A protein has these predicted regions:
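Gly/Ser/Thr-rich loops at beta-strand to alpha-helix junctions
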Residues: 151-154, 236-241, 260
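Short, positively charged, Gly/Tyr-enriched micro-motifs
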Residues: 2-13, 81-187, 227-228
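Short, conserved catalytic/metal-binding motifs centered on acidic residues
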Residues: 52, 63, 102, 146, ...
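Short, conserved DNA-binding cores of transcription-related domains
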Residues: 2-110, 114-115
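RNase H-like nuclease fold core
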Residues: 3, 9, 159-232, 237-244
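Short, surface-exposed amphipathic charged segments that create phosphate/polyanion-binding patches used
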Residues: 190-193, 266-278
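Inter-helix linker motif
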Residues: 251-267
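Acidic/histidine-rich catalytic cores and adjacent linkers
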Residues: 4-7, 56, 60, 71, ...
Length: 492
């Protein structure tokens, strides 16, 4: 009977040890440790910190210098940060590392036990560095928050990213978009130049400046065969961008983004309305003084009917009429003390100045033209010529100036009506040539600058921006890359 109990006990102990080995192996796999011979000898939890003790079984070592057998000089425990399983806890690996010494008294060579998952003298596993780098893809994450997440210093997180990540320029596609983004890092980096692949939306590159002394050596360094393959260059109405076609892309045609053309006339109308607001505010101020009022720093002059309507409802003039939701039901206006609907506000604006209706109607003609001829540049050319003739003879100086603008950029505007096929999440679709995608990309650059509360290192900003906004960034992990040489030249 006793023999049976001993056998059963031995079986239970053996089964328990087998389970523990399997359990330890699963934990090491879960921790993603590269050294398969490592075992977990202990686990403890102290507050919000988990401690896992790792060690290897002793094995025979021979001196790499003389070939004599080496003896262990004992164990040294290293604290290693390994940011896996961070479910509200900090995870610390207690790594028991042996030190070996050659038994030959004439040699005395010593070495420390090495591990593949952590480098010598490092307090973080190799996986930590890769996870830190991956965290920089989130534009909403600051370097400080990333460092806090992985229990490292801000400096370590930034140095790790800069050490491993070097982003090269992407190849040019046959449709390229260019635009500037305001960074204002220093006297050399005020407006950076964003270059984008129109098909994929990925940023091709980010240049420190849009000035000639930056762009000229940069584009000249790109092989001519690659630049000759560009068919369309999309930009706003900034003349140096349009001149890129003749200087750098000999086979391309310039495309002026339709959004910027519409923004030009909207800005002019808005400035006209603001001038009206200033006029009525000045009138109200003079009436207040003439009626015995005293002007000081505490004086508040209530907004007149004209100022109120022009300030709060000028969007009825500026917004595309097709996108305005007109409501017929009357609602009490607390400032005017009357029941009003959208049509009433519109009529009230036109009664203040009938020119506002003329401006709105002339603006709507261009909005409708811009929306109706996508994919049909030939008919767009005919309609644009008719619009130019209408604006030139309308008697309104704002639209006469607009007609001059349309004449100056006539062919570039027509090119924006070309449609091309793009691949999206839902499959293939037709898209009009526009700078819309690059405007969205610029907002990400501005958000990154704001989140970092200002940047002073352009190379780090460039690398972070490209790494975070490309779909599948390829890390060029080399110490240096070939920078662009900038020359002291003024813009043309």
């Amino acid at each position: 009977m006793i023999l049976v109990l001993i056998c059963l006990y031995s079986y239970d102990v053996s089964a328990m040890k087998s389970y523990e080995r399997r359990h330890m192996n699963s934990i090491t796999e879960l921790l993603d440790l590269e050294d398969s011979e490592i075992t977990i000898s202990d686990t403890t939890i102290e507050g919000q910190t988990k401690f896992i003790t790792l060690e290897t079984a002793p094995s025979v070592h021979f001196c790499p210098v003389c070939g004599f057998r080496m003896h262990s000089k004992g164990l040294h425990t290293r604290k290693i940060n390994h940011p896996v399983l961070q479910d509200g806890y900090r995870l610390v690996i207690l790594l028991k590392q042996r030190r070996w010494k050659c038994s030959d008294s004439g040699c005395g060579y010593c070495l420390n036990e090495s591990f593949r998952f952590v480098n010598k003298a490092k307090r973080n596993t190799n996986a930590t560095d890769m996870m830190i780098i991956n965290a920089f893809r989130d534009l909403d994450a600051s370097a400080s928050s990333i460092a806090q997440k992985f229990k490292v210093s801000d400096t370590y997180a930034l140095e790790t990213f800069d050490r491993y990540v070097k982003m090269d320029r992407l190849p040019l596609s046959d449709i390229v978009s260019v635009d500037e983004v305001y960074l204002d890092m220093d006297e050399y980096c005020s407006y950076a130049l964003v270059i984008q692949d129109f098909y994929t939306g990925n940023p091709i590159d980010l240049l420190i400046s849009r000035r000639t002394n930056s762009t000229e050596p940069y584009f000249a360094a790109i092989p001519l065969s690659e630049r000759c393959a560009v068919k369309y260059l999309i930009s706003d109405m900034y003349n140096p961008y349009i001149q890129y076609v003749g200087k750098y892309f000999p086979n391309a045609v310039s495309v002026v983004d339709s959004f910027h053309v519409a923004q030009w006339i909207l800005h002019k109308i808005d400035m006209y309305i603001r001038e009206m607001i200033r006029y009525y505010k000045k009138r109200d101020r003079e009436d207040y003084i003439n009626n015995g009022g005293v002007i000081n720093e505490h004086t508040y002059i209530p907004a007149s009917r004209e100022v109120y309507l022009l300030t709060k409802y000028r969007w009825l003039i500026l917004k595309n009429q097709s996108t305005i939701l007109y409501h017929k039901d009357l609602r009490m206006d607390r400032h005017l003390h009357v029941m009003m609907n959208t049509y009433d506000y519109e009529s009230a604006l036109f009664r203040i100045n009938p020119t506002l209706k003329e401006l709105r109607d002339l603006k709507e003609k261009y909005v409708q033209f811009n929306a109706h001829y996508a994919g049909n540049p030939m008919d767009a050319r005919i309609e644009l010529d008719e619009l130019i003739d209408l604006y030139l003879h309308c008697g309104n100086t704002i639209f006469e100036d607009f007609a001059d603008l349309l004449i100056r950029y006539h062919d570039y505007i027509i090119n924006s009506f070309v449609m091309v096929e793009k691949h999206g999440a839902g499959g293939i679709y037709n898209s009009r040539l526009s700078n819309g995608p690059i405007e969205a990309l610029n907002r990400k650059a501005k958000d990154l600058k704001r989140l970092g509360r200002g940047y002073r290192n352009f190379e780090h900003f460039r690398t972070r921006f490209l790494y975070a906004t490309r779909d599948n960034p390829v890390i060029n992990a080399v110490p240096e890359y070939n920078p662009v040489t900038y020359y002291d030249m003024e813009d043309e």
